[in-house]
Structures are given as structure tokens and as C-alpha cells.
UniProtKB/Swiss-Prot annotation:
<dbReference type="GO" id="GO:0034080">
    <property type="term" value="P:CENP-A containing chromatin assembly"/>
</dbReference>
<feature type="compositionally biased region" description="Acidic residues">
    <location>
        <begin position="125"/>
        <end position="139"/>
    </location>
</feature>
<dbReference type="Pfam" id="PF04795">
    <property type="entry name" value="PAPA-1"/>
</dbReference>
<keyword id="KW-0804">Transcription</keyword>
<dbReference type="InterPro" id="IPR029523">
    <property type="entry name" value="INO80B/Ies2"/>
</dbReference>
<feature type="region of interest" description="Disordered">
    <location>
        <begin position="1"/>
        <end position="265"/>
    </location>
</feature>
<dbReference type="GO" id="GO:0031011">
    <property type="term" value="C:Ino80 complex"/>
</dbReference>
<feature type="compositionally biased region" description="Polar residues">
    <location>
        <begin position="246"/>
        <end position="255"/>
    </location>
</feature>
<feature type="compositionally biased region" description="Acidic residues">
    <location>
        <begin position="49"/>
        <end position="93"/>
    </location>
</feature>
<dbReference type="InterPro" id="IPR006880">
    <property type="entry name" value="INO80B_C"/>
</dbReference>
<feature type="compositionally biased region" description="Basic residues">
    <location>
        <begin position="102"/>
        <end position="120"/>
    </location>
</feature>
<comment type="similarity">
    <text>Belongs to the IES2 family.</text>
</comment>
<dbReference type="GO" id="GO:0045815">
    <property type="term" value="P:transcription initiation-coupled chromatin remodeling"/>
</dbReference>
<feature type="modified residue" description="Phosphoserine">
    <location>
        <position position="128"/>
    </location>
</feature>
<comment type="function">
    <text>Component of the INO80 complex which remodels chromatin by shifting nucleosomes and is involved in DNA repair.</text>
</comment>
<keyword id="KW-0597">Phosphoprotein</keyword>
<protein>
    <recommendedName>
        <fullName>INO80 complex subunit 2</fullName>
    </recommendedName>
</protein>
Length: 295
């Protein structure tokens, strides 16, 4: 329909342009000379041109309708051939189907090659769009399945994430890999596990040690009490300070007969030098013990 309207516009516009050129070419003097006859001739010519345009448009419409009918018939034939081919070959891809459509169509008739080529292109474009839509639907469905199904927690094997020593301990060796690692003792740290006999011997030893410690503690306490009692007895034999003993001995008698010594006064004044300066004169006072230092 769009092509039909464009052809009509082109055909309608061409005579008006011709008339405009003719009218421009005619000078004013010739129009005055010809007068009414020239105007009537121009009007008749324009009417004839319009009739020719309408006839050409009608012919184009009839040709276009014939082309459409031919295209529909060829499309039906192509559909039948495609159905037969699909029944014969179930594993055929969509691409050869499109090529068969192009090749199976009959040659155009009545000179409508360009329009039929355009219709073929539209059919092929529709098929390609349908195929692209199917592919997009398939990709969307694949994405939905991918997101709906949970991913496994461990995509890589466990042996790939272990060290060489860990694999050797568990006995997992790769191709061409030799077990050259030294195996450490299983219990390098921690307490040693004892047998029941060793446990019984250890308990007996601990009981013996506790018994010896208690006996030693008792002996020490006994010795402390004995020393304390002996110390008290030795203190009771001594006279108290300031009192004479009840039984005078030879030592006490000799002490009483001894001459008493003079008691030394422990108080000593502060030793200092005194300097005195008056109108009569100055003087220096020095204590007796310090005179030898100033002589």
C-alpha cells in the first residue's frame, strides 16, 4: 500500500510540474496573442494528463493484485513442499529450510520482479526474526534453569585443594607423583598414654610420697615444740632485769665488792663557734674541745 501511494504521488506530481514549466516558458506576449483559445487548449491538455494518470494507476493496481495472488500461490506451494521435507527429514536444521524457500519459488510474471523480491525479503526477515526469537527464548529458559538449580558447594575436587603432604597422608597421589615424604610419629605432643599397670604403679608411688611428706611434717613439728620448751626453761633460770637473784653466788659477791665507776653524762652541748662584733670590738668564742683546731 505504501508503494502504491508513492507511485500515485509521483504520477500526480509529474504533470503539474510539466504544466508549470510550460506555463513559465510561455511568455506574456504569446498568451495575449493566443487569448482564450490557448487557455482552453491548456485546460484540455491537463484533463487528458489526469486521465492518463488514472489509467496508469489502475494498471499498477491490477498488476500489484496479480503479483500478490502469485506470491500467495507460491507461498502455499512452498509450505506444502516444506511439510513434505519435514516429514521426510526430521533432523533438518532451520537454515536449509530458509534456502529451500528461496529456491522453490517460481519466477515472477507480468514484470513485478521488484515487488516480489521485496515480499521474499519480508518473508525471509520474518523467518529469521522467528528463529532469533526462538533462540532468545531458549537462552532465557537455560538461564532460568541455571538459576533455579542450586550450584554445587564444591566445584573443584577436594584433592586439588589439599597440600602435597595432606594428599600423601590420606593416600591420594596424582599421576607421576611419588610418596617421598617422611611420616612423623602420630603423638609428638601431649601426654603419653599409659597402660593400666603403669597407672597402678604411679598411684602407689604417689601414695608413698604423700605418706613420707606427712611423716616429715610431724617430725618437724615435734622438734619445734621440743626447742620451744627448752628455750623457756633456759629463760626461767636467768634473773630479771633490775632484780638480784634469790641465791647469791660468788659472781654476785665479787661484783658488789668492786669499785663503782663514774657515770658519764651523755648530754653534750652543741659544739659551735661564736663570733661577736660590737662597738668595743670583735671577739670569737671557741669551745674547749675545738681549741686544738684553732691553735
Amino acid at each position: 500500500m505504501a508503494r502504491r501511494r508513492s507511485t500515485r504521488r509521483a504520477l500526480v506530481e509529474t504533470p503539474s510540474d510539466l504544466n508549470a514549466q510550460d506555463s513559465d516558458s510561455l511568455s506574456v506576449s504569446t498568451k495575449e496573442e493566443l487569448g482564450d483559445d490557448a487557455l482552453a487548449a491548456e485546460e484540455g491538455q491537463s484533463v487528458l494528463d489526469e486521465q492518463e494518470i488514472e489509467e496508469a494507476l489502475e494498471e499498477d493496481d491490477t498488476n500489484y493484485e496479480e503479483d500478490i495472488i502469485d506470491d500467495e500461490e507460491s507461498a502455499q506451494v512452498d509450505e506444502e513442499e516444506l511439510e513434505e521435507e519435514e516429514e521426510e527429514e526430521e533432523d533438518a536444521t532451520p537454515e536449509p529450510v530458509v534456502t529451500s524457500k528461496k529456491n522453490s519459488r517460481s519466477k515472477p510474471k507480468n514484470g513485478g520482479a521488484s515487488k516480489r523480491k521485496a515480499s521474499r525479503r519480508t518473508v525471509v526477515d520474518e523467518d529469521s526474526e522467528n528463529l532469533e526469537g526462538d533462540e532468545e527464548d531458549g537462552s532465557f529458559s537455560d538461564l532460568k534453569d541455571l538459576y533455579s538449580n542450586p550450584m554445587p558447594a564444591q566445584t573443584t575436587p577436594v584433592s586439588m585443594r589439599m597440600t602435597k603432604r595432606q594428599r600423601a597422608i590420606q593416600g591420594i597421589l596424582e599421576e607421576g607423583e611419588e610418596d617421598e615424604l617422611l611420616e612423623l610419629p602420630p603423638e609428638t605432643s601431649g601426654r603419653k598414654k599409659l597402660t593400666p599397670e603403669e597407672m597402678a604403679l604411679r598411684r602407689i608411688e604417689n601414695a608413698r610420697r604423700r605418706k613420707n611428706q606427712s611423716e616429715r611434717r610431724l617430725e618437724e613439728e615435734k622438734m619445734e615444740t621440743i626447742n620451744r620448751l627448752l628455750k623457756r626453761q633456759s629463760n626461767t633460770g636467768k634473773p630479771r632485769r633490775g632484780r638480784a637473784p634469790n641465791n647469791p653466788t660468788s659472781d654476785s659477791i665479787s661484783r658488789s665488792k668492786a669499785v663503782p665507776k663514774d657515770r658519764i653524762n651523755m648530754y653534750q652541748p652543741f659544739q659551735c663557734v661564736r663570733f661577736k662584733s660590737t662597738k668595743e670590738g670583735s671577739s670569737l668564742g671557741v669551745p674547749e674541745p675545738l681549741i686544738r683546731f684553732f691553735s
